[in-house]
Amino acid sequence: MLCTVLALIWDENNISYDAFTLVNQAVEAAKSRPETRQQASFINACLRRFLRERAALIELTSQQEEALWNHPGWWIAKIKKQYPQCWRSVLAANNRQAPLTLRINIRKITSTAYLEQLKKLNIDARWVGGAGIELKRPQSVESLPGFHEGWFSVQDAAAQLAAPLLMRGVQHKSDLCVLDACAAPGGKTAHLLEISQCDLIALDIDAIRCERILDTLARLGLTAAVKVGDAAKPEDWCEGKLFDAILLDAPCTASGIVRRHPDVRWLRRESDVPQLAKIQSELLDVLWDKLVPGGRLLYSTCSVFLEEGDGQTKAFLAKHKNAVLMEAPGHLLPSAGEGESTLDENVSHDHDGFYYALFTKHQG
């Protein structure tokens, strides 16, 4: 309660009610509940001191990087070291509100036709590349036209690159066999099915999350073989099968999607980075053996940390001499609609942070 009211009264030029009114209401609310009644005086004292010393206290916080950027110190230090030219923009983007971006199901409707549907309802939206449409103002997804009919999914513009990247160059093959490892909740699985004709296995270690994949596919009118299993143990689910294309959206720190999951920066510990990098490396090694010669593997994470991106790619190429690195975006830093964007078609310049590396297996 104390933190909530402090946030409300922090900026005296941007509050809807008189600050003292908000303080009084907070104190009365604390008194009204047995579990907070004894803290009412403490809450009152803290808030009133803040109002008396607002300028000085805010000045103090501006001198502390953790308070200024709302990130833990180790995270700030890592971003500074890895992105010395643009670390401020990365941290600032994490503190912005993420847009509501849709991916149109092209098996059901075109982007142009869906924009017309939104226009009829006075919903302001724009095309942002590929099958992506961004709403100017977020609203309930189920209230949008065509949700129950499977016309669209919610997916960030950067995440929408995965399926086209993987399928480019292999779509022409007949009897195409594709694996989506670590597939839940199913957004990329669905996108793969929307843009190609393939026999697809969607794999995830979590049975409950696999149910979400099935629900997603059912709403969109798509089908895949959904399996519960550990991608690191293919002997339990693979049945000796090899794949023409593999998408490994690996477990990661989620350091690229902080604006969608603000708590992740405080839940993560610095020690998580090498631990997750080890898991990513193991998954890459195991799944590489399940790729046919000439096949493609797309490695992706929603992370901006180099250990989970370029560092992983360099180590993989050094270990697997039959791996050839293909053209892919690499690190996409989170962007909040300002300046240049590494997504050429994304006119909004508003997307999460991601990493993509595309490998093909040499046939020699």
Language-model-detected regions and their locations in the chain:
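S-adenosylmethionine
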Residues: 1-364
